[in-house]
Amino acid sequence: VASSAVVASREVFRLFLIKPSHYDDDGYVIQWVQSEIPSNTMAVLNGLALDCIERKVLGDNVDIEIIAQDETNTRIRPKNIIRAIGEGGSKGLVALVGVQSNQFPRAMDIARPLRAAGVQVCIGGFHVSGCMSMLPELPADIREAQDIGISIFAGEAEGRLDEVLKDAYNSELKPVYNYMPDLPGMEGVPTPVLATPNIKRNIGNRTSFDSGRGCPFQCSFCTIINVQGRKSRYRTADDIERVLRENLDQGVTNFFITDDNFARNRNWEAIFDRIIKFREENNADIKLIIQVDTLCHNIPNFIEKAGRAGVNRVFIGLENINPD
C-alpha cells in the first residue's frame, strides 16, 4: 500500500520596516528621488530580521518576508501594505522604526489607516524611548497611539526582536515593550545591513552603521544619554570588518558611521586600523562619513588614521560656544 504524506502549506509573515519622513512647513512630506543620509535604525533592524529568518524564529513552516522602506526616498502607500499583508491569508507587522519627535506626526498618519484595517503596528525610536525615559507620564501623542492599538517599543532591539515577531505572528502584540532599563551589548550581534535596492536609493550608494552607543558624560543639553544610556557600548573591530565584508559583497563601499562622536569611541583606533587593513587587502575604495568634536585633532594619530581609513567627510559638533 502506498503511503501518502501530507505536506503542510507554508505560511508567509510580512515584516514592513518603515522609516517615516516628516512634514515641511506647508504640510508636505519631505521626500527625495535619492536621499543623503541612510537610516541606521532600518539597517540595524533589517540585519536583526535577517538573523531571525536564518534561525527560523517563527518555525520551520513560516517564511518571513522583509520589506524595508525609507520614506525620505520611497512613497509609502498604506493601501498597498494592507493588501500585501492580507494577501493569501498571510500575516504581518508594520514596524515604524527610528521615529524621532518631528517624525511622530507622520508616523501616526501612516499608522491610522493601517490600524483601521486591522494591521498590527509597532512604533519605536527616539521619541517613544526618550519620552518613556525622561517624562513622568506619557505625552498625548503616544497615548493616542496606544488608544488605537499601536504597540510601543522603547529601547533597542538586539535580542528582543524575536519576542515581538512571535507576538505579532500570534496576534498578541503587547501594548508596550519597554527595554530602556536593560540596554543590550553590541559585541557579536547581527550586523546592520540593507539590501542593494534600498542602498541605491541613497546618494552615492551609501549605507550606515553604528560602532558605539551611549556616553559616560552627563551634559545637561544632551538627549542621547537619556535614550542610549550613560554606559558606552561598542562593536569590536571584528564586528566592523563583518559589516564591511557583507556590504562589499554587494558592491557597497560608502558608509556613514552614525556615532554622535566617533572620536570618543574607545575602540576608534582598532576600528580604523582594521578598516585600513581591509582597504589594502581587498583593494576596496572605502569611503566614510564620521561625526566628531572640535578637539579630536588633539588625539594622537586620529586625523592621520582617519584619512588612511577613507574618511572624506566630517560633521563637527559645536556643543557650546563661549562668546569670550
What are these regions, as identified by a protein language model?
Residues 1-3, 324:
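Accessible peptide chain termini
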Residues 188-324:
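Radical SAM [4Fe-4S] cluster-binding motif and immediate context
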